[in-house]
Amino acid sequence: MNELEYVPVPAFEDNYIWLVSDGRDAIAVDPGEAAPVRRVLAERGWRLTAILLTHHHADHVGGVDALRNSQPDDAPLPVYGPAAEAIGVVTRPLAGGDRVTLDAPAVAFDVLDVPGHTRGHIAYFQTARQGAAGQGNAEPHVFCGDTLFSCGCGRLFEGTPAQMLASLDALAALPGDTRVHCAHEYTLSNIRFALACEPGNAALAAWRDDAQALRARGVPTLPTTIAHECAVNPFMRADSAAIHATLEAELHETVTDRLAAFTLMREWKNRFR
């Protein structure tokens, strides 16, 4: 059985469409544009076999129709996505607790409910490849859309702070070595805000230097890992006394608990420059 390859395909200004392939067949996660996906598929000689969607925003679903229309009539492309959102292109609606099992490539995902950015947002957690009895992946993977970014989280367009914090807690509970495939290259701007929240975080300062070096070479800062984000991401560190002290000093608000800290951080981030 071939190893799986995880390829970030740049789209728009800062999106990543993720392709997962065994060297022959591939699935696309959140294809907001069709052209970049088609280009990579053609360059590598891969066949697209399924699409996974995390939420309804146009920069995540806009390329689906074009990709489906380019498929042979005898090989319709299944499109998986959240049942709780009105996404017309979805043919296989999903909810948290469901499992997606694919044959080509042979891979399985557990579906996680992660509302906040949108009300019905889901994530896909890959634990083990189908048919590999007794064998797991070298590491797990999660495709989290716009819920979690490196050193950040998605804006709350539809959900509440409590929902988003619970969603981040659910992701934080995944194994620490889980590779986190975020949908945007926001890392450098997020690090600036994270350092404002927690200037004494040495791991965060080191990540700033590493991320700057990666971007200077045109290399993605993703995937990250759950353990790394728990060490550097202020939105996953809402119980940090250092962050609480910063929020009280900068915003002149009393931080009563981690939800209050998260809410203040998210509001601050919305206007941070």
Which residue stretches match the model-derived regions?
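Accessory terminal helices/loops
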Residues: 169-179, 188-273
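Active-site metal-binding motif and surrounding structural segment of the metallo-beta-lactamase
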Residues: 34-81
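Conserved beta-strand hairpin/beta-sheet module of binuclear metal-dependent hydrolase folds
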Residues: 1-46, 124-129, 136-144
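Active-site-adjacent loop/tail segments of enzyme domains
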Residues: 152-178
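Divalent metal-coordination and catalytic microenvironments
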Residues: 20, 30, 55, 67, ...
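Active-site neighborhood of phospho(di)ester-bond hydrolases with catalytic His/Asp-centered motifs
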Residues: 29, 49-57, 78-83, 113-116, ...
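Active-site environment of divalent metal-dependent phosphoester hydrolases
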Residues: 14, 35-36, 56-62, 86-89, ...
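Core dinuclear metal-dependent hydrolase active-site scaffold
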Residues: 19, 99-136, 173
